[in-house]
């Protein structure tokens, strides 16, 4: 019984201790001129859906949830955001070549069609981020139009 108490105390001290390890924040006060929304004159309804469903992980400005202040959850989110931005950063859209843009648009279309994005782990907590069938069609049609006009 004594060993269990010691292990519990060590675990509690460790958990409290890791709360003081900072994480990198993905927040910016400005929207760059190279942003996907600005460059492509995206309709307002699609802008809103992309903001809610995509931009937290695929831009330079994440709207952090309350649970981001708890370790080790914050580390998981930080890694997830870094991976998302490495794959696609909407804020850097205009810096991509036409060929790369077409590739990214094909990928976006495919992932929305297959229900791969937004991730289930994200929509589990952020219900508003999930695409309805109508929203998915609208976004896919817009992305297809963009790709065809490159």
List each model region and its residues.
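Post-cleavage N-terminal segment of exported redox proteins
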Residues: 1-39, 145-150
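Sequence context of c-type cytochrome heme-c attachment sites
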Residues: 26-41, 90-94, 120-125
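Short microdomains enriched in Cys/His and/or Lys/Arg
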Residues: 38-42, 74-89
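Sequence/structural segment immediately N-terminal to covalent heme-attachment motifs in c-type
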Residues: 42-55, 77
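The canonical Cys-X-X-Cys-His
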Residues: 50-61, 117, 139
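Acidic helix-start/capping segments at beta-turn-to-alpha-helix junctions
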Residues: 64-78
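Electron-transfer interface patches adjacent to heme c in soluble/periplasmic c-type cytochromes
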Residues: 80-110, 127-136
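C-terminal capping alpha-helices of c-type cytochrome domains
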Residues: 114-116, 123, 127-150
């Amino acid at each position: 019984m004594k060993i269990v108490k010691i292990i519990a105390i060590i675990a509690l001290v460790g958990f409290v201790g890791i709360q003081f390890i900072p994480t990198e924040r993905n927040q910016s006060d400005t929207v760059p001129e190279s942003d996907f929304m600005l460059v492509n004159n995206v309709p307002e309804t699609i802008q809103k859906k992309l903001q809610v469903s995509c931009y937290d992980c695929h831009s330079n400005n994440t709207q952090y949830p309350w649970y981001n202040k708890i370790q080790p959850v914050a580390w998981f989110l930080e890694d997830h955001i870094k991976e998302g931005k490495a794959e696609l950063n909407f804020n850097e859209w205009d810096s991509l070549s036409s060929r790369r843009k077409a590739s990214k648009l094909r990928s976006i279309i495919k992932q929305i069609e297959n229900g791969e994005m937004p991730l289930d782990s994200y929509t589990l907590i952020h219900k508003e981020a999930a695409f309805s069938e109508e929203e998915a069609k609208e976004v896919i049609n817009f992305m297809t139009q963009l790709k065809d006009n490159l």
